[in-house]
Amino acid sequence: MQIVHTPRELKEARIALKGSVGFVPTMGALHQGHLSLIEKSKEHNDYTIVSVFVNPTQFLPGEDFEKYPRRYEADKKICELAGVDILFMPQPDTIYSEDEVLVKAPHQKGYVLEGHFRPGHFDGVLQVVNKLFHIVLPTRAYFGKKDAQQLYLIQKMVQDFFMDIEIVPCEIVRDNDGLALSSRNVYLSDAERKKALLISKSLKRAAKMVQSGILDIQEIQKEMQNILQDLKVEYIAFVDRDFRPLQKIQIGKTIILVAAYVGSTRLIDNIWL
């Protein structure tokens, strides 16, 4: 595995790759969810590139940028064992410059839900992903469905900017107890982790209600709120695949999303129906 630290080094390494290239952008603290993306990339492509970069522009003031878990040596070992071809580990000053040309999230879809509670977050996400795409020039890029709104906005950016990149959505990976894997799960105490399971429990309950023929969103939302009453819920949302609000469940087109605080840790999860 080759490890590079600057865009120039990565571009030089990329030129030598003859064949399809899969790309898995991450913020590090790699877990089984990230590994599932890497495995998909290796399955689909001749080469796989992974980036580990805690992107400062997607954190709001007062968020956890400084304490976000950084495990660079462990991440290197994980990528090497997974068969990654190139690992890109840049510093912010190699990615960003002063007074940059900016990529902005669309107002209607980028400033609702996650974008409402974290205004400007998706500006930072799209800015860095756009840069990474231009450096890596991947054939395909892999993103988890857990960050569903991010996935949608990246797909839209690729479409709107006529990028010749296939975005591959990948299923949410969960622990045996149902908790969606997240690098932020390390913040949870044992008691908080048990509470966090209420999020996936509420989504499973919603899915069962839909399977039983209940399509009324208010009824499903009320049931979910009852399950989540011990958490500080920011939103429970029902949207279609293009992140338009729904008035009624549409089978095969619905995403139910939850964002909630468990103690001081903010978690998100969703289910695609």
Swiss-Prot record:
In terms of CDD domains, this protein maps to:
PanC
* Catalytic residues identified in the record: 34 (proton donor)
Which NCBIfam families does the UniProt entry name for this protein?
Answer: cyt_tran_rel, panC
What pathway is it annotated to? Cofactor biosynthesis; (R)-pantothenate biosynthesis; (R)-pantothenate from (R)-pantoate and beta-alanine: step 1/1
Can the keyword Ligase be found in this entry's annotation? yes
Which domain of life does this protein belong to? Answer: Bacteria
Q: Which chain positions lie within coiled-coil regions?
A: none
Q: What further note is attached to this protein's record?
A: The reaction proceeds by a bi uni uni bi ping pong mechanism.
What is the species of this protein?
Nitratiruptor sp. (strain SB155-2)
Q: List the GO biological process terms.
A: pantothenate biosynthetic process
Protein name stated in the entry = Pantothenate synthetase
Q: List the EC numbers from the record.
A: 6.3.2.1
Query: Carries keyword Nucleotide-binding?
Result: yes
Q: Name one GO molecular function term.
A: pantoate-beta-alanine ligase activity
- In which residues is (R)-pantoate bound? 58, 150
